[in-house]
Every structure is written in structure tokens, then in C-alpha cells.
Amino acid sequence: MSKRIAGPEIERLIQLLAKVPGLGPRSARRAALHLIKKKEQLLSPLAAAMSEAADKVRICSTCGNVDTADPCMICTDPRRDAGTIIVVEDVSDLWALERAAAMNVRYHVLGGTLSPLDGIGPDQLNIRSLIDRVAGGEVKEIILAVNATVEGQTTAHYLTDQLSGFDIKVTRLAHGVPVGGELDYLDEGTLAAALRSRTAF
């Protein structure tokens, strides 16, 4: 049993920080110490921001994004192409695509991927509302931006099957060589996907 090195409030802060993805126990201790040292500049404003987020953040009933409004800012933006929806696994994927700023479209967050071994079927994901959005008639293209994992591919095939009865185009992100990537450092699966996804030059 490890010795306690601080009061219960500090220990609780460290334990909670350690649950944040990317922070292990050591990183959580360092983060907690930094926050405590910068109490006025960081800890107090962070606590206030987290409390406000807990009160005001909602899940968008249209697309599954997180925002302080429902529907979210993306779904209500009239400048976005409502005819194209990019389907992603998680909100973090949506944010990554938004940072790339490649397309001004709408999104749909599934909340994960199909994984029968983990007990995750279609009913556990945000799939029914995607079908309902497509059935509304405004959507012309669905872009499947799921990860290139077994579960991601299973989900993509399932969605393609579910959307086959609609007069829409279903596409998927190309997989392959990253910008600035050297072929010698890529794995065989990535190279094979790049060859299959080749385009005219």
C-alpha cells in the first residue's frame, strides 16, 4: 500500500486527472502540482470553466456533436452544405476534420463502432437518426470517415447496406500515404490501401 503524500482533496484531484486520456498517474501528479502552484491563473478559472461546461454542454439531437446549443452550431449554420454529411465515430474525429477545413459540410457522430464482442450493436450507436436524416430527402452524399480498423470497416459496410435503398452517393475517405510520408516507413496495409485508392495525376 502506497503512502499518502497529500490531503484527500489533492489525492482526489490527482485520481480524477489520471482518468483523462493521455494522463497517467505521474502526469496527473505533475498536472495537479502545476495547477495548485498556479491557483489563481489556472486552477480557479479551470474549475469555473469545468463547472460551466458541466451545466451548459449538450449533445446535439441532430448530429451527436457536443455544444452549448441544441441543435449545435454546425447543424444550424446556413453556409454549410446540408446535402453532404460526413459520418465519424467520435466528436474528436469531427473536430479533427474541422481543423483540416477541407469541406464546409454537416456531420453525424456515431458514438463508436459496431463491435459484437464488446456488445455494441446498431442500437447502441447513433445510426437510426442518420437513417432518418437521409430519409428527409435533403442529403445527396454520405462520406464515411470511420477508422481503418476491423470495427470501423464492419461499421462502414453495415451503414452502406442500410443506406442502399436511398438515392444517395455513399463514399469513404481514401486511405494511404500521409502527406510528407516516406514509403519505406509505411506498413504493408497502408501501402496496399494507397495503391487501391490511387488517383489520376
UniProtKB/Swiss-Prot annotation:
PROSITE patterns: RECR, TOPRIM
Toprim domain location: 83-178
InterPro entries per record: DNA_Rcmb_RecR, Rcmb_RecR, Rcmb_RecR_Znf, TOPRIM_dom, TOPRIM_RecR
Annotated keywords: DNA damage, DNA recombination, DNA repair, Metal-binding, Zinc, Zinc-finger
SMART domains linked to this entry: TOPRIM
Xref: SUPFAM superfamilies: Recombination protein RecR
Ranges annotated as C4-type zinc finger: 60-75
Name of the coding gene: recR
Highest taxon listed in the record's lineage: Bacteria
Protein name according to UniProt: Recombination protein RecR
Function: May play a role in DNA repair. It seems to be involved in an RecBC-independent recombinational process of DNA repair. It may act with RecF and RecO.
The species this protein was found in: Mesorhizobium japonicum (strain LMG 29417 / CECT 9101 / MAFF 303099) (Mesorhizobium loti (strain MAFF 303099))
Gene Ontology biological process terms in this record: DNA recombination; DNA repair
Family from the record: Belongs to the RecR family.
Molecular functions per Gene Ontology: DNA binding; zinc ion binding
Membrane-spanning parts: none
Keyword Magnesium: no
